[in-house]
C-alpha cells in the first residue's frame, strides 16, 4: 500500500512487469513466472536491489528513504505467499487472501514478495519462527536439519555479539531457481539460489561450509544493512564486507566449524590479493555517482579486501573494542541510515583511538604493501637484531599501519614447531621487534601468524622490499 498525502493508494501489478531474478536481466515474456521443467509448477520471486521496487509499487528507490509496508495478496489457494512479515490467510474459493502485518521501516530494495506452490519446512525448536521454502521438485534435497541448526546458531551468536535481539518476528529462507545472485538479504525473507545450495549428492565438507557461510552472511545483514542501512550506495562495500567478515567470525565462534578462517584466506583473501595487484585495482571506498553505477565496483576489492581489512581492523583495535563499537553503531542508528564514518568513529571511540589516518590509508588508497622479516644472528646462535621491513607495493604506493603476529618456528623432526609469537604494530618502512632479540635463531619465521594482516609477506630473508 502506497500512501499519498496520508491517504492509501492501492495498486496492482501483473507479473509481467516484474523483474525475474536479477533486475538487470529483465525477463521479456508474457509472464515472469518461473516454470519448473520437472513438474510444470509455476513460481515467482522478487529481487529489487538496487532500485527496482518501483516496478511493483509507486516509490522512490533510494536506501535513505525508508518506509513501512502493508501488503495484501490474492493467490491460488495451494500457493505459499511470502513477504517481510507474517500473514493471515483466509480462503475465498480457488483463491486465498494473504494479509501481511505492517512491517517496520526499511529501504525499498529490501522488500520481498515470493509466491508459488512451495514445499514448506518449519523449525519446531527455534525461538524465532523459522521456515524454509523450496520448489516441490527440489524438496527432497532440502537438508532442513542442518540448515535450521546453522540458523539457530547464527541467531544465538549475533544476538549476543551485537547486543540487539533479532527484531523482525520471523525468518524465512526461500530457495528459488534461476536466481542470478547467490542470495539476497530481504528483511526476514532471504532468497537463496537453489542450485548453489541444495545438493542432490552427498556434499563435500567444503560445500557444507560454504552454505553455512552464506546463511550466516545473509543473517548478518538483518542487523547491518536492514536495521541500519547505508545512506547511499557509496557504502555498499561496507555492507557486504562487514557481512562477509561477520559470517566467518560467526562460523568460528558460534558453530563447531573452527577452520572457517582458513577457508576465508584461501577464497576471499586470495581473491582480494589477485584483484588488488591488477592495473584495474581501486580503493575500497569509491564514489557512486548514481544508482545505475551501484554495482560498477562489485568485485574482489569490495568483498575480499574489504572483509580482510575489517579483520585487520578488529585485530588493530582489539576484538572486544571492535565488538563494542559495532554494537554502539547499530544501537545509535537503528531503523535509520548511516555512513561509513559513523561506523569507524564508533569503533574508534570504543577503542579510544582516532581512526581518521587509518581510514585514509586503508580505505581511500589502492594497492597492497609488502612485508618481510629481516634479522641477524650472533655467534651464540641467538637473534641480535629483528626488524620488519615494509614496502609501498603497487597502486597508490603508500605505507600503512599494520598490527600482526610474528611467529618463530623450529624444526622438530621434520615438522615445524611453534616456539614464540609476539604482537607487533608496524609503522613506516622499518619496525624494530626488540621482544625477539635474544631468542634462539629460528628455522622459519612467519610474519603473519593468525592471518590478521593484509599484505604480501615474503618468507625469504634475502628479499628487501625497501629496494623493490
What are these regions (language model features)?
Residues 355-356, 366-447:
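Beta-strand-rich binding/interaction modules
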Amino acid at each position: 500500500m502506497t500512501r499519498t498525502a496520508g491517504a492509501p493508494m492501492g495498486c496492482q501489478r501483473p507479473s509481467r512487469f516484474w523483474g525475474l531474478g536479477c533486475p538487470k536481466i529483465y525477463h521479456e515474456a508474457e509472464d515472469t513466472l518461473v516454470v519448473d521443467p520437472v513438474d510444470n509448477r509455476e513460481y515467482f520471486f522478487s529481487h529489487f536491489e538496487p532500485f527496482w521496487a518501483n516496478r511493483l509499487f509507486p516509490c522512490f528507490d533510494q536506501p535513505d528513504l525508508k518506509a513501512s509496508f502493508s501488503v495484501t495478496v490474492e493467490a491460488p489457494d495451494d500457493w505459499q505467499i511470502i513477504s517481510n512479515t507474517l500473514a493471515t490467510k483466509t480462503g475465498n474459493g480457488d483463491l486465498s487472501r494473504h494479509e501481511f502485518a505492517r512491517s517496520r521501516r526499511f529501504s525499498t530494495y529490501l522488500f520481498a514478495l515470493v509466491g508459488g506452490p512451495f514445499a514448506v519446512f518449519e523449525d519446531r525448536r527455534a525461538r524465532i519462527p523459522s521456515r524454509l521454502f523450496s520448489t516441490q521438485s527440489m524438496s527432497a534435497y532440502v537438508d532442513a536439519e542442518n540448515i535450521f541448526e546453522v540458523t539457530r546458531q547464527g541467531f544465538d551468536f549475533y544476538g549476543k555479539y551485537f547486543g540487539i535481539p533479532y527484531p523482525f518476528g520471523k525468518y524465512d529462507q526461500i530457495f528459488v531457481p534461476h536466481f542470478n545472485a547467490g542470495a539476497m538479504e530481504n528483511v526476514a525473507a532471504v532468497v537463496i539460489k537453489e542450485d548453489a545450495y541444495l545438493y542432490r549428492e552427498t556434499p563435500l565438507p567444503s560445500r557444507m561450509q560454504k552454505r553455512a557461510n552464506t546463511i550466516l552472511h545473509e543473517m548478518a545483514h538483518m542487523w547491518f544493512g536492514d536495521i541500519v542501512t547505508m545512506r547511499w550506495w557509496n557504502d555498499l562495500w561496507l555492507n557486504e564486507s562487514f557481512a562477509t567478515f561477520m559470517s566467518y567470525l560467526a562460523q568460528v565462534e558460534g558453530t563447531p566449524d573452527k577452520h572457517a578462517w582458513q577457508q576465508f584466506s584461501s577464497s576471499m583473501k586470495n581473491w582480494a590479493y589477485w584483484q588488488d595487484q591488477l592495473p584495474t585495482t581501486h580503493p575500497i571506498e569509491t564514489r557512486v555517482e548514481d544508482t545505475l553505477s551501484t554495482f560498477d565496483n562489485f568485485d574482489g576489492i569490495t568483498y575480499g579486501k574489504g572483509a580482510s581489512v575489517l579483520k585487520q581492523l578488529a585485530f588493530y583495535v582489539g576484538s572486544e573494542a571492535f565488538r563494542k563499537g559495532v554494537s554502539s553503531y547499530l544501537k545509535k542508528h537503528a531503523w535509520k541510515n548511516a555512513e561509513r564514518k559513523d561506523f569507524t568513529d564508533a569503533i574508534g571511540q570504543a577503542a579510544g583511538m582516532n581512526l581518521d589516518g587509518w581510514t585514509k590509508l586503508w580505505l581511500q588508497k589502492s594497492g597492497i604493501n609488502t612485508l618481510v622479516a629481516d634479522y641477524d644472528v650472533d655467534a651464540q646462535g641467538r637473534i641480535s637484531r629483528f626488524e620488519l621491513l615494509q614496502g609501498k607495493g603497487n597502486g597508490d604506493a603508500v605505507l600503512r599501519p599494520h598490527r600482526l603476529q610474528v611467529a618463530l618456528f623450529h624444526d622438530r623432526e621434520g615438522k615445524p614447531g611453534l616456539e614464540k609469537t609476539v604482537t607487533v604494530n608496524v609503522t613506516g618502512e622499518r619496525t624494530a621487534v626488540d621482544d625477539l632479540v635474544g631468542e634462539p635463531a629460528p628455522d622459519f619465521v612467519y610474519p603473519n601468524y593468525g592471518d590478521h594482516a593484509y599484505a604480501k609477506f615474503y618468507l625469504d630473508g634475502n628479499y628487501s622490499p625497501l629496494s623493490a
